[in-house]
């Protein structure tokens, strides 16, 4: 396999994720698109690590670190969405005006 294939896949996933972030009004869908972007970044790190130097595992270590951060972000994000849904009964981003002033 060539590195171009992995980079093409990662860029397609990243573009789909950014499109979803910019156009979606559902907060759960926004979190899913953010996870898609993070997975595209992981593909890039692993592909570059594999094709540049076979001996070192720096790309894999960074990818595991990003997966850990993404899992924590997803858990906290979904907990916040669930709490806001219980109070507001909606998951629409436009209705998240929780600041009073």
Swiss-Prot record:
TM regions (residue ranges): 2-22, 32-52, 61-81
GO cellular component terms attached to this protein's record: chloroplast thylakoid membrane; NADH dehydrogenase complex
Disulfide links within the chain: none
Entry membrane topology: Multi-pass membrane protein
Keyword terms, alphabetized: Chloroplast, Membrane, NAD, NADP, Plastid, Plastoquinone, Quinone, Thylakoid, Translocase, Transmembrane, Transmembrane helix, Transport
Alphabetical list of Gene3D superfamilies matching this protein: 1.10.287.3510
Top enzyme class: translocase
Entry keyword annotation includes Membrane: yes
The enzyme's E.C. designation: 7.1.1.-
GO function terms (MF aspect): oxidoreductase activity, acting on NAD(P)H, quinone or similar compound as acceptor; quinone binding
Annotated catalysed reactions: a plastoquinone + NADH + (n+1) H(+)(in) = a plastoquinol + NAD(+) + n H(+)(out); a plastoquinone + NADPH + (n+1) H(+)(in) = a plastoquinol + NADP(+) + n H(+)(out)
Gene Ontology terms: biological process: ATP synthesis coupled electron transport; photosynthesis, light reaction
Main location (coarse class): plastid
Cross-referenced NCBIfam families: PRK05715.1-2, PRK05715.1-3, PRK05715.1-4, PRK05715.1-5
Job of this protein: NDH shuttles electrons from NAD(P)H:plastoquinone, via FMN and iron-sulfur (Fe-S) centers, to quinones in the photosynthetic chain and possibly in a chloroplast respiratory chain. The immediate electron acceptor for the enzyme in this species is believed to be plastoquinone. Couples the redox reaction to proton translocation, and thus conserves the redox energy in a proton gradient.
Subunit structure: NDH is composed of at least 16 different subunits, 5 of which are encoded in the nucleus.
Family under the similarity heading: Belongs to the complex I subunit 4L family.
Protein name: NAD(P)H-quinone oxidoreductase subunit 4L, chloroplastic
Gene expressing this chain: ndhE
């Amino acid at each position: 396999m060539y590195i171009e294939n992995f980079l093409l896949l990662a860029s397609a996933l990243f573009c789909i994720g950014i499109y979803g972030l910019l156009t979606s009004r559902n907060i759960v869908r926004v979190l899913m698109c953010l996870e898609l972007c993070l997975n595209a970044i992981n593909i890039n790190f692993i592909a570059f690590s594999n094709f540049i130097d076979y001996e070192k595992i720096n790309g894999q270590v960074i990818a595991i670190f990003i997966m850990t951060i993404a899992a924590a972000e997803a858990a906290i994000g979904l907990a916040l969405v669930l709490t806001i849904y219980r109070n507001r009964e909606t998951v629409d981003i436009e209705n998240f005006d929780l600041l009073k002033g």
